[in-house]
Amino acid sequence: MDPKRSQKESVLITGGSGYFGFRLGCALNQNGVHVILFDISSPAQTIPEGIKFIQGDIRHLSDVEKAFQDADVTCVFHIASYGMSGREQLNRNLIKEVNVRGTDNILQVCQRRRVPRLVYTSTFNVIFGGQVIRNGDESLPYLPLHLHPDHYSRTKSIAEQKVLEANATPLDRGDGVLRTCALRPAGIYGPGEQRHLPRIVSYIEKGLFKFVYGDPRSLVEFVHVDNLVQAHILASEALRADKGHIASGQPYFISDGRPVNNFEFFRPLVEGLGYTFPSTRLPLTLVYCFAFLTEMVHFILGRLYNFQPFLTRTEVYKTGVTHYFSLEKAKKELGYKAQPFDLQEAVEWFKAHGHGRSSGSRDSECFVWDGLLVFLLIIAVLMWLPSSVILSL
């Protein structure tokens, strides 16, 4: 945001305690913007001076209203969501409550409190559902809701459409209209990221990263947290009158703009921590069967022990099937310029926090995980073989 007018700016960030939300808040704060972080739990990091944290549950309208009480908010960055990966993907009720009801609450309060701008953090998944997409753009239709392989993607699609349909909604007392846009980021990475990278490192350290899968030519995309911060700030500016409200009612794909094989992207992390990158490659359909089994085990045992599934079916598609998108619209309308980044920062972060291969022997837990992994893979092979035979006939 323009520092010359940042004194007048007061923004509210839902999901502000999360990795990306906190990073965005710090960047805006450095520009002199008054920042309010709204989340169900407080940030793990020290909150810088000038940033206010308000604890609350986005599912409760009264909590959302309280977050707006003491500030004349001029822009909301709606980042809060639930169910992106792992065991969270299997909690359908909570996913809907946070992603859909939470968005309804935000839109309602924005209208009441006469907030002129709302930037929604969406996902590639509103378009992608396991089909190959090469250099897709924003003209692609939404994936039909019943075709989404997971509830997170389905609810994010519903929420994005609600946000964009709310564009130009009159604010209370006839005080202007609400301008909205949606950013669809690829998978986020960066030093200190707490969702995807720690899970991957945990698998590496437990000796579970034994294979890759799918076509080695398959391509996906990622976005560094700082590029995503840049895109959100630009989007909020592009909703202004002096920018011709160019982003008003529009979606934008956001990534680093460098399609890459999913497993090759993570090779520097594996080898940088001193581990051997696996050479075994399995068929995508076999791993999909394996993921189905882990989901079934979680369904049966999850109430007794809410363990982290090794993989979900959606994660298999997202990592093993080609899907990447053009940045032309974001470049042209927002002025977005992706900066070059890699995983080296993340490698150094993990090393600084005690991760990396040591010279000691593997502990007994690794052998237990090995046994469970082999057992599930054998069952997956038995499930997969009949279907592979049928396909070959």
UniProtKB/Swiss-Prot annotation:
GO CC list: membrane
Keywords: Membrane, NAD, Oxidoreductase, Transmembrane, Transmembrane helix
GO biological process terms on file: steroid biosynthetic process
Keyword Oxidoreductase (UniProt): yes
Catalytic residues (UniProt): 152
Membrane topology per record: Multi-pass membrane protein
Highest taxon in the source lineage: Eukaryota
Entry similarity comment: Belongs to the 3-beta-HSD family.
Name this polypeptide is given: Short-chain dehydrogenase/reductase family 42E member 1
Native source species: Homo sapiens
